[in-house]
């Protein structure tokens, strides 16, 4: 006799897979409310029938859209932005978790023209992954460069970096491979690798975004450098104004140690290397490599005379690699893909990509990573969208507070080291600060001298005293006191600072001053600002009044 089956059918619904939502943890996004948006999303979806996995990723670099919320869909990640906490309820009602339509919907993020036109090499993972997730890092190509490097003799690693054409991204543009070989050729047993993360130039934020958005990449680059030159210890020197970057790098180092990416016998290779974070005290001069080394040693940040260079006698008198964040962060990609793949990007002696940072009076500020050779006009118009104020662009300062002011007639310059040097300018760290037609260029020239006088370490007279005299002379010029004579004095002073200063602090301060006088001379032909009225005119700001 057959017993009837009385088991009730299973009518329970299987648990739904969580929907992945991304909200940046980058400090720029946090400054405009990303944390509150993340909290609102978690609160609104808690206990719902659609489980949500919230990932705090880095920023994509489209800063005018922050906080940028992304939702993973079968078609790809759909973006919404800029999102405020008050928008969350409406977004969820409109089907946010399915990529639904809404006025803030931007479409598939990877297809947005701002991103689609770029060559993201160094920034390939930033904004895509959870910065402190080792699984994310490995899933997106992490450690490929280090594993390749560890299979090669140190000399071949240096050859690969040299053949790639990688130059220092901190401003000087010195070939990275040459610096590495100099350190490797030193016989000292104790050597160091130092990452200069004292990003103090106005309008620059790429180093911060790397540290906050892809810290393992930077650790990987430092470890490759250590293998190449025989170093066992390295330091990050991070400016105190970057607390989020400091916290992220410290957390990443601890995680790397637990996964044997740092410490003894790294990945079974026999390499021993460890990293430490040191926080600067806020001095701009410590962005200069020898001042940074002085600060790392616990001393006041002052410039060291050269020679000897740090590659021969650096930290604690030992051979030391000092490279910028972007330089070291690019090394893993070069080792993973090969020197030729990187060398094929760019133009002339400027190979690979540069991370341009658009700031100042600009409609769409953010990160643009593209091959060298793009023009300044393309960056300003195609990416930046003109000024935030809606007024015409009058000038752009490229390369930080010591960079030249470029007029509209030079906006078709290709963005590469040689073209800028020929034009009397420099690329620097890739920062662009935009000014509209209301800017007073005499005031900007004065500011360059004033900035130098405040930030000078004081070690050399041309910088320490010359910058103070520069402020005084410019004040006399715009006040109408013996203009021609004082312009001649200013020119002589600029020559003295350029030729006599110990470092680029005093040596480059004349660059913005001279460019302002050369390209915007009308701004120096008006009476002083005391009691005067500024009015806009087609060429810039004029000061009305009698002389």
Each predicted region: which residue ranges?
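Gly-rich Lys/Arg/Thr-decorated short loops/hinges at beta-loop-alpha junctions or inter-strand turns
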Residues: 129-144, 193-207, 310-315, 357-362
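Ferredoxin-type iron-sulfur electron-transfer modules in oxidoreductases and energy-metabolism complexes
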Residues: 17, 35-56, 73-99, 144-163, ...
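Conserved phosphate/anionic-ligand binding catalytic regions in large, soluble enzymes, centered on
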Residues: 28-30, 64, 142, 161-183, ...
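Short amphipathic, charge-patterned alpha-helical segments
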Residues: 44, 221-223, 371-388
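Accessory "access/gating" subregions that flank catalytic or transport cores
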Residues: 147-187, 344, 349, 357, ...
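Histidine-anchored nucleotide/phosphate-binding helix
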Residues: 214-228
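Flexible inter-domain linker/hinge segments
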Residues: 101-163, 326-338
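Hydrophobic alpha-helical positions that pack around
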Residues: 118, 246-372, 384
């Amino acid at each position: 006799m057959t017993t009837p089956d009385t088991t009730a059918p299973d009518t329970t619904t299987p648990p739904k897979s969580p929907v992945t939502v991304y909200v940046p943890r980058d400090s720029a996004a946090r400054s405009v409310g990303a944390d509150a948006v993340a909290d609102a999303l978690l609160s609104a979806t808690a206990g719902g029938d659609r489980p949500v996995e919230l990932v705090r990723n880095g920023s994509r670099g489209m800063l005018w859209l922050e906080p940028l919320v992304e939702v993973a869909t079968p078609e790809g990640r759909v973006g919404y932005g800029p999102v405020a906490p008050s928008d969350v309820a409406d977004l969820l009602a409109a089907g946010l978790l399915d990529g639904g339509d809404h006025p803030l919907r931007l479409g598939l993020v990877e297809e947005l023209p701002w991103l689609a036109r770029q060559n993201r090499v160094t920034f390939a993972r930033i904004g895509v992954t959870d910065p402190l997730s080792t699984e994310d890092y490995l899933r997106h190509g992490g450690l490929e460069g280090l594993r390749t490097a560890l299979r090669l003799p140190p000399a071949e690693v240096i050859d690969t970096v040299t053949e790639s054409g990688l130059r220092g991204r901190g401003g000087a543009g010195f070939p990275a491979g040459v610096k590495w070989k100099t350190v490797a050729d030193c016989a000292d047993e104790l050597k160091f690798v130092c990452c200069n993360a004292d990003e103090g130039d106005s309008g620059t934020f790429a180093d911060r975004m790397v540290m906050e958005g892809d810290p393992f990449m930077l650790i990987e680059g430092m470890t490759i450098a250590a293998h190449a030159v025989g170093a066992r210890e390295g330091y990050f020197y991070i400016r105190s104004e970057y607390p989020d970057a400091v916290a992220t790098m410290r957390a990443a180092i601890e995680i790397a140690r637990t996964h044997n990416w740092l410490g003894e016998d790294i990945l079974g290779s026999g390499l021993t290397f460890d990293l430490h974070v040191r926080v600067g005290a806020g001095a701009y001069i410590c962005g200069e490599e020898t001042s940074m080394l002085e600060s790392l040693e616990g001393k006041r940040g002052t410039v060291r005379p050269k020679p000897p260079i740090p590659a021969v006698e650096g930290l604690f008198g030992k051979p030391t690699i000092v490279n910028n964040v972007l330089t070291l962060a690019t090394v893993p990609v070069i080792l993973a893909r090969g020197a030729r793949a990187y060398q094929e990007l760019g133009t002339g002696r400027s190979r690979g990509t540069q991370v341009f940072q658009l700031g100042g009076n600009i409609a769409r500020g953010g990160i643009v990573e593209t091959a060298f050779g793009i023009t300044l006009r393309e960056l300003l118009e195609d990416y930046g969208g003109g000024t935030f104020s809606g007024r015409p662009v009058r000038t752009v300062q490229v390369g930080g507070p010591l960079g030249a002011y470029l007029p509209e007639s030079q906006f078709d310059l290709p963005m590469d080291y040689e073209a800028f040097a020929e034009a009397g300018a420099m690329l620097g760290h890739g920062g662009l600060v935009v000014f509209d037609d209301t800017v007073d260029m005499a005031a900007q020239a004065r500011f360059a001298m004033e900035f130098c006088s405040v930030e000078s370490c004081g070690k050399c007279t041309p910088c320490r005293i010359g910058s103070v005299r520069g402020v005084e002379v410019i004040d006399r010029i715009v006040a109408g006191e013996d203009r021609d004579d004082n312009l001649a004095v200013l020119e002589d002073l600029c020559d003295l600072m350029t030729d006599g200063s110990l470092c680029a602090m005093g040596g480059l301060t004349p660059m913005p001053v001279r460019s302002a006088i050369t390209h915007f001379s009308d701004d120096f032909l008006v009476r002083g600002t005391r009691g005067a009225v500024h009015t806009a005119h087609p060429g810039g700001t004029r000061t009305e009044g009698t002389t």
